[in-house]
Structure formats: C-alpha cells, structure tokens
C-alpha cells in the first residue's frame, strides 16, 4: 500500500524557457517583433516539480543541467521555491537545455529546443533505494519522449524496482518525433500505476483519435490507468477499461497554454499524495491547468 505521507520525486527534462508572445509567422530573412516575453525555468520536469512545490509538496527533482548561466538561474529558482536538487547533476562540459517558445494568436506554443545536458538523464539516474530512504512515495517521469537516454532497454527494470518498494509510478509523454516509434514505451506500461498523455499524443501512439479507443489500446499494451488530457474539454480517465470524461471549467482569459499539461500532472499528483482518488485528482489537475493558461510561460515564479 502506498504511504500518502511521503515526498514526490520528478524525473524529467529541464530547460531555460524564453517565451515570446505573440508570433504567428517567422519569415526566413526578416526581423519580427512581438508584444511580450517571459524568461523562466521550463521543461516538463521543472514545470511539474515547481507546480508540486507550489502546492506545498516535498519534491525531489531528478534531472541534469550544464554548468552555465542558464543552470545558475535554474538552480537559484529551484532553491528559492524549495525543491530538493540532491538528485540533480550538473555537467561542467555541457550546456543546459534551452527552449524558445513562440506563442501564436491562438495561444499555442511552438518550440525551438536544444536538449543540452538533458541527454545525460539515463536509467541509472534512478536510485530506488536512495529515493525510498528519502521518503519518496511517488515517482513521476515527465517528458519521456524528449529524454533520449531513457529510450532504450533497461528503464523498465528501474520502474519495477520502484514499484517493489511501494512507490507509485506515473509517466507523462510529450510530443516529439521519437513518438513515431513507440516500441520503447510499451515495455514500461505494465510497471506504471498511471500513464498520461494528451489527445494528439494518444493518436500518434495508438492510431486512434478518440480517447476511449486510444485508452483501449493502451490498456491492451499493459497500462493499468490512463489519463488523456483534452485541453479545454478536460480529460478522459480510464481505469481497467472503464472510462469517463471529466469536464473542465470555462476559462475566459486564456493567454498561453505552455505548461498546462505539466500543471495538470502536478495537481493530480499532489491530490493523490493527499489521499484523493483518481477522479478527484483529475479535477484538481484540471483546476491547476486552468490557472496556468492565464499567464505567459509555463510557471509563475513571482
């Protein structure tokens, strides 16, 4: 049985985000202007960890950065917010990940990205024994498909060891060309308590554009519980083949959807850690996501 009086560890990509709003077109040879910008920590791992810390959770971040000015800003922010980085490694010969997000007039971001030190995040970065010693009861993988070091054999063994220690394991993918060949994902599904993706990702992975059919394929592949994020429509929750739509409230002041999925994951995990069931946890995730889309950038660190 999972002990809910525990910490949460987040493994995932971390970047310095530069978000530009709004940019609808990028001519090849011309300069362009935009209205506003935000420079913040980013990446699925950092976003989710910050969201959890904002909810009052004890959070360990399992990540890799370079040893540069970008990393200094990231670490300073994490320390200020209260995230434990004892499982985060700095590499002196490598730059940190950086993402430039171009948010269009429909509030949708496009990213120019360099992975930097994120490529060094590998199965051996997961230390089940040490995580358990630190009181970790929940382990979340954020941005799986943009972590090339995890797209190989061996990661499922680490997830299995986490579950053997009664640690709740969840995994959230992120849109990436690597999704076109999902064979690395399938062996992981039986070792997850919860699998998350959005509808576009679900269609790429399963070939089905409706959440019920997509969930069915994911269950056949070994997933126990599936949450498919549906943006402004809420999410689809499927447990043991029984699915239902959990609607989202209307949000009038949408500015930028960057990081909404990570905010959803943070709210969901925080609620599960407090002992709520998956239905209740999804509603908490939707609430946090609805707040995130009302400001520029994935996180609000003010």
Region roles according to the model:
Residues 92-94:
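Short, glycine-/polar-rich solvent-exposed loops and beta-turns at beta-strand/coil boundaries
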Residues 1-14, 77-90, 103-194, 199-245:
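Ribokinase/PfkB-type carbohydrate-kinase core domain
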Residues 1-64, 69-83:
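Glycine-rich phosphate/adenosyl-contacting loop at the front of the ribokinase-like
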């Amino acid at each position: 049985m999972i002990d809910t009086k525990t910490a949460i560890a987040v493994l995932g990509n971390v970047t310095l985000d530069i978000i530009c709003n709004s940019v609808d077109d990028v001519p090849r040879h011309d300069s362009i202007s935009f209205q506003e910008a935000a420079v913040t920590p980013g990446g699925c791992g950092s976003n989710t960890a910050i969201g959890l810390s904002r909810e009052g959770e004890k959070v360990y971040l399992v990540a890799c950065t370079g040893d540069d000015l970008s990393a200094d800003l990231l670490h300073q922010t994490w320390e200020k917010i209260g995230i434990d980085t004892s499982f985060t490694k700095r590499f002196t010969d490598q730059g940190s990940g950086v993402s430039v997000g171009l948010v269009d007039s429909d509030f949708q971001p496009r990213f120019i990205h360099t992975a930097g030190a994120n490529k060094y995040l590998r199965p051996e970065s997961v230390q089940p024994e040490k995580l358990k010693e630190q009181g970790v009861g929940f382990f979340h993988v954020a941005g799986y498909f943009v972590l090339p070091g995890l797209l190989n054999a061996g990661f499922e063994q680490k997830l299995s060891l986490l579950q053997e220690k009664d640690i709740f394991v969840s995994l959230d993918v992120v849109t990436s060309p690597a999704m076109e060949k999902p064979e690395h994902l399938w062996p992981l599904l039986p070792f997850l308590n919860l699998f998350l993706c959005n509808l576009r990702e679900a269609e790429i992975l399963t070939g089905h554009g409706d959440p019920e059919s997509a969930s069915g394929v994911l269950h056949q592949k070994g997933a126990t519980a599936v949450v498919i994020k549906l943006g402004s429509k809420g999410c689809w929750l499927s447990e043991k083949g029984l699915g239902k739509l959990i609607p989202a409230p209307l949000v009038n002041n949408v500015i930028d959807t960057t990081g909404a999925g990570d905010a959803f994951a943070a709210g969901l995990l925080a609620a599960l850690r407090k002992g709520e069931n998956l239905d209740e946890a999804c509603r908490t995730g939707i609430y946090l996501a609805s707040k995130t889309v009302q400001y520029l950038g994935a996180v609000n660190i003010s």
